[in-house]
Regions:
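Glycine-rich active-site loop/strand segments that organize a redox cofactor
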Residues: 50-84
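Glycine-rich FAD pyrophosphate-binding loop
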Residues: 23-44
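N-terminal Rossmann-like FAD-binding beta1-loop-alpha1 element of flavoenzymes
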Residues: 5-30
């Protein structure tokens, strides 16, 4: 008997989780308030880090681990960072195999570039639209699973609440944003992959659809939470009309500097750090 997983959120995390669950024998119901093509993940520009060592710099997952902990200033979970850095290279290669159009060198190796806080070039990228390329490949893969009957997608459905019996979650309720119909999903597990909370802020480079309402409902239900203060801000933007457009971290990774004025004088200068301190 197959287990059923409901995933709330169909961006990079939700799609990846769906494919992983199917690979491990689960069936998946994939719920999202918008189509995957409009997820925040599509907007990611810069790249994805892994110690692939295609530049002959003698890079390694251990160095990736050390750089990441250093850049985190003691706030990162060492066990989580170790797992991520050990798995990163194989994950990036599997994404390339899945169809992500990463930049490659003349020798047909994955190209790598600098990002902030790392000693070696270890950022794989797809021109300036890495997120879009990642999402395109993952969406295609999930649609193949949908055709096979292992994934059922529910775009334009909003999460409303969990179905709880004491401390046991037995499913969730979602609502069709067009018809208002409520659907009750009974399942073996619910995975929340709804992204950040930046839609709460007046000025953001992210999608305004990321309102944080799912997190708020989970908080109301008493679901244990951690690291809610870890909201990333992006220091390079261009203001166009009412929306802040993101300038990739790659601009700083290649040596670009950021100057902010206070009383007409530069007071903040962020430069690419070739050796984390």
């Amino acid at each position: 008997m197959k287990h059923t997983l409901v995933i709330v959120g169909a961006g990079l995390a939700g799609l990846s989780a769906a494919l992983t669950a199917v690979k491990n024998g689960w069936t998946v119901k994939l719920v999202s308030s918008l189509a995957s093509e409009r997820a925040q993940s599509v907007m990611a520009e810069g790249g994805i880090n892994a110690a692939l060592n295609t530049k002959g710099e003698e890079d390694s997952p251990e160095q990736h681990y050390t750089d990441t902990l250093t850049a985190a200033c003691g706030l990162a979970d060492p066990n989580a960072v170790w797992g991520m850095t050990q798995a990163a290279s194989e994950l990036v290669r599997s994404l390339h195999h899945l169809g992500v159009q990463f930049n490659v060198t003349d020798d047909d190796e994955l190209d790598l570039r600098n990002f902030g806080g790392q000693k070696k070039k270890r950022t794989a990228f797809a021109q300036s639209d890495t997120g879009k390329q990642l999402m395109t490949a993952l969406i295609d893969a999930v649609r193949r699973e949908e055709s096979a009957g292992t994934v059922e997608r529910f775009p334009h459905h909003k999460f409303r609440t969990l179905l709880l019996s004491g401390n046991i979650c037995g499913g969730c309720t979602v609502q069709d944003t067009y018809t208002g119909e409520l659907l009750r999903f009974v399942c073996d597990a619910v995975l929340i992959a709804t992204g950040g909370l930046h839609g709460l802020f007046g000025d953001t480079t992210g999608s305004l659809a990321n309102t944080g309402e799912v997190t708020a409902e989970l908080f109301r239900l008493g679901v244990p939470m951690a690291n809610l203060e870890m909201i990333q801000y992006h220091p390079t933007t261009v203001e166009l009309g009412e929306k802040r457009m993101l300038l990739s971290e790659a601009a700083r990774g290649e040596g670009g500097r950021l100057f902010a004025l206070r009383n007409g004088k530069p007071w903040l200068s962020l430069i690419h750090i070739s050796e984390p301190t």
